[in-house]
């Protein structure tokens, strides 16, 4: 089997396996800004080539506190920039903790997630995926409660039909005493088309419609469009976003605008070519509600 070149790895056309169902809309979503409020200081420190820790201090009206995070990446190299196992975790001073474990054995990839809030298990989720030559089959179990007989099961299937077209389906099954009738299931269908400079993806189900479009204008400029329609509440929102980079200046800008008249953006500027200091400015404004939020952050490492 020939080793893929760097250009092939960087190509927007996926390799033989179509990837995970959860990643159908990821390319477009990566363009959107992740806005924050207040002041934030983040320090990332690599202790070795496999282990990294982070310290985050946040000051805002909604969230003030300190969080410690750690990341471990194993030595099982399965791709040019992919190694397993991966362990992620972070916690605050009150003991509220989230943790994730990812591992891959052959064509099987597993993911375990857990969350503890106020000393109690707030959520748990386990996922296993089988990645074949032309398809990915996934099964997720979430918040399974054997005592109260409640939980969520999700089955996903994504298939490569042509080098550019992927189709898939998802079945979500939830059961429990709080569910009308004791159980409910939702079936969704999905498709993704990948061209040289754009990716279009769609998810259609009884609960609504989700459409995304990603366009790579050039090496440093990309656009994203997202349409979400929730049939249960009768709401629909369209969002336009862009991402631009100036590598020579160390500048990255992401901004978005939606049909709820909300504008948001995050500006990042590398302060030094020799030192790993990055300044981040964030802002959101809703013109209808006349409400705005502003954030400033410093990232070290």
From Swiss-Prot:
Pfam families: Porin_3 (PF01459). Its main location: mitochondrion. Keywords: Ion transport, Membrane, Mitochondrion, Mitochondrion outer membrane, Porin, Protein transport, Transmembrane, Transmembrane beta strand, Transport. Disruption phenotype: Mutants arrest during the larval developmental stage. Impaired mitochondrial homeostasis with the up-regulation of the mitochondrial unfolded protein chaperone hsp-6. RNAi-mediated knockdown results in embryonic lethality or larval lethality between the L1 and L3 stage of larval development. Surviving progeny are growth retarded. No localization of the mitochondrial targeted protein nnt-1 to the mitochondria of intestinal cells. Residues 1-19 have a biased composition (Polar residues). It comes from the Eukaryota. CDD domains: Porin3_Tom40. InterPro entries: Porin_dom_sf, Porin_Euk/Tom40, Tom40. Ubiquitously expressed, but highly expressed in the pharyngeal muscles, the nerve ring, the intestine, gonadal sheath and in the tail hypodermis. It is found in: Mitochondrion outer membrane. One of its GO terms (biological process) is protein targeting to mitochondrion. Signal peptide: none annotated. Forms part of the preprotein translocase complex of the outer mitochondrial membrane (TOM complex). Interacts with mitochondrial targeting sequences. Channel-forming protein essential for import of protein precursors into mitochondria. Specifically required for nnt-1 accumulation in the mitochondria and may be involved in the secretion of daf-28/insulin from the mitochondria. Required for embryonic and larval development. This is Mitochondrial import receptor subunit TOM40 homolog. It comes from Caenorhabditis elegans. The gene is tomm-40.
């Amino acid at each position: 089997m020939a080793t893929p070149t760097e250009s092939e790895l960087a190509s927007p056309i996926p390799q033989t396996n179509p990837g995970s169902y959860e990643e159908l809309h990821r390319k477009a979503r990566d363009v959107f800004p992740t806005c924050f409020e207040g002041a934030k200081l983040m320090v990332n420190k690599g202790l070795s080539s496999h282990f990294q820790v982070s310290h985050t201090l946040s000051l805002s009206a909604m969230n003030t506190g300190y969080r410690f995070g750690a990341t471990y990446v194993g030595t099982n190299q399965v791709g040019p920039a992919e190694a397993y196992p991966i362990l992620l975790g972070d916690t605050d001073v009150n003991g509220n903790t989230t943790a994730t474990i990812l591992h891959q054995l052959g064509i099987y990839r597993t993911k375990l997630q857990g969350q503890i809030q106020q000393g109690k298990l707030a959520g748990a989720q386990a996922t296993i995926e089988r990645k074949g030559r032309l398809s990915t089959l996934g099964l997720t179990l979430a918040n399974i409660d054997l005592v109260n007989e409640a939980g969520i099961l999700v089955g996903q299937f994504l298939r490569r039909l042509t080098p550019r077209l992927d189709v898939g389906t998802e079945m979500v099954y939830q059961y429990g005493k709080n569910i009308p009738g004791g159980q409910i299931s939702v079936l969704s269908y999905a498709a993704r088309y990948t061209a040289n400079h754009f990716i279009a993806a769609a998810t259609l189900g009884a609960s609504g419609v989700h459409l995304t479009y990603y366009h790579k204008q050039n090496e440093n400029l990309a656009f994203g469009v997202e349409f979400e329609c929730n049939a249960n509440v009768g709401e629909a929102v369209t969002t336009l976003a862009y991402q631009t980079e100036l590598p020579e200046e160390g500048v990255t800008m992401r901004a978005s605008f939606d049909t709820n008249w909300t504008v948001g953006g995050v500006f990042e500027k590398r302060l030094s070519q020799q030192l790993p200091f990055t300044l981040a400015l964030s802002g959101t404004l809703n013109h209808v509600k006349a409400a705005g939020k502003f954030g400033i952050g410093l990232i070290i490492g």
